[in-house]
């Protein structure tokens, strides 16, 4: 199952602008002609400079990056947990996401009204947080009597019950579950919204992007969660231009090192607990997505289940060693290519060829 990141935000925060930029930036359309994508799903390539360099060494015909899926979740309003706006539908869509990306408005623009009449990022963040906490409170309050009943017949459920009660206490105090010591594995079946990792995207205008003091204030608002600063309107203009000199000149002019969408894709990938390994050959150079901590056979299974079933060993060289030596042949001669067995835990940037027997 693809892990997705749900994008949420109050009306007029710039969520749709950001999402449209994400969907225009559509690696899937180019590489997977048969993929049908829901209209509210944006699939974004994870930028990785290693791929182009590998493709050069192997003279690969094409390059396929890892991808992250973002899901556009219809606007949240105050009272969503009571069923206001698209309330309940909204909350069930977030439940399906593995992480939540909240777009928060920082830009001031007389022509774009703010739902509360004033631009106040701190208030916006707590409005959404409050709705998610209220929704979780309802879930936990409903679950506790059921868990109490189950625990009477099955002692193993006692730990889940205790964790649910602990979560309830924190939620009543207004604390998201992710910011507590509650064992998230024990409350996983409840699909609590505030147990998901959060990424905050602050939608700024050009001047604000250069204002380090403002950015520090915003970071402090959401720490320890990741904060990303971008101008959604500028990002969608960049995507229109594609990868050309004009786009690079625009970035330079803004004093930004790389597009905000690239940062968002990378942070999203990391927040989902994912990493990549690389395969390369004349046909393609490709980044494959695996959970951090995956073993070599599990990694092989991402290419094809037969690879996992018939796994014998993996021939592995680190990307850095391969680049330093220039070719696979030289890496082998220098003793940098290793044979790893089924207990090997994959490292980020391993360049791999699997040996299997079906």
Can you annotate each of these PLM segments?
Residues 1-109:
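Conserved G1/Walker A P-loop phosphate-binding module
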Residues 42-47, 74-84, 95-157, 170-181, ...:
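Conserved Switch II/interswitch segment of TRAFAC-class P-loop GTPases
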Residues 69-72, 99-102, 200, 228, ...:
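Protein kinase-like catalytic core scaffold
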Residues 96, 347-348:
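Short, flexible surface segments
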Residues 2-8, 13, 19, 146-345, ...:
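C-terminal-of-GTPase-core extension/linker across diverse P-loop GTPases
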Residues 34, 48-51, 64-70, 84-98, ...:
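Amphipathic alpha-helical transducer elements in NTP-driven molecular machines
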Residues 24, 56, 92, 130, ...:
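Short, intrinsically disordered, mixed-charge
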Residues 30-31, 112-116, 212-214, 241:
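Short amphipathic alpha-helical segments
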């Amino acid at each position: 199952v693809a892990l997705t990141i749900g994008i949420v935000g109050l009306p007029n925060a710039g969520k749709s602008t950001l999402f449209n930029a994400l969907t225009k930036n559509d690696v899937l359309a180019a590489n997977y002609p048969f993929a049908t994508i829901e209209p509210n799903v944006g699939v974004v390539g994870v930028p990785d400079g290693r791929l182009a360099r590998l493709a050069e060494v192997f003279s690969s015909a094409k390059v396929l990056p890892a991808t992250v899926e973002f899901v556009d979740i219809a606007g949240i309003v105050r009272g969503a947990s009571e069923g206001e706006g698209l309330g309940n539908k909204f909350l069930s869509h977030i439940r399906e996401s593995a992480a939540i990306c909240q777009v928060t408005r920082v830009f001031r623009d007389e022509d774009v009204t703010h739902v509360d009449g004033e631009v106040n990022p701190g208030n916006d963040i707590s409005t959404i947080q409050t709705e998610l906490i209220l929704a979780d409170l309802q879930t936990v309050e409903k679950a506790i009597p059921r868990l109490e009943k189950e625990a009477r017949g099955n002692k193993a459920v006692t730990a889940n019950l205790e964790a649910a009660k602990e979560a309830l206490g924190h939620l009543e105090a207004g604390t998201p579950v992710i910011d507590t010591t509650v064992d998230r594995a024990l409350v996983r079946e409840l699909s609590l919204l505030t147990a998901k990792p959060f990424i905050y995207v602050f939608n700024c205008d050009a001047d604000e992007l250069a204002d380090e003091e403002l950015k520090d204030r915003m970071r402090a608002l959401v720490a320890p969660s990741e904060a990303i600063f971008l101008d959604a309107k500028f990002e969608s203009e960049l995507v229109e231009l594609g990868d050309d000199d004009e786009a690079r000149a625009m970035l330079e002019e803004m004093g930004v090192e790389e597009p905000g969408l690239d940062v968002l894709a990378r942070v999203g990938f990391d927040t989902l607990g994912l990493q990549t390994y690389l395969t390369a050959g004349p046909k393609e150079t490709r980044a494959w997505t695996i959970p951090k901590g995956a073993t070599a056979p599990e990694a092989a299974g991402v290419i094809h289940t037969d690879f996992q079933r018939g796994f014998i060993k993996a021939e592995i060289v680190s990307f850095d060693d391969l680049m330093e030596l220039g070719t696979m042949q030289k890496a082998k001669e220098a003793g940098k290519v290793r044979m790893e067995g089924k207990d090997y835990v994959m490292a980020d940037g391993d360049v791999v060829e699997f040996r299997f027997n079906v």
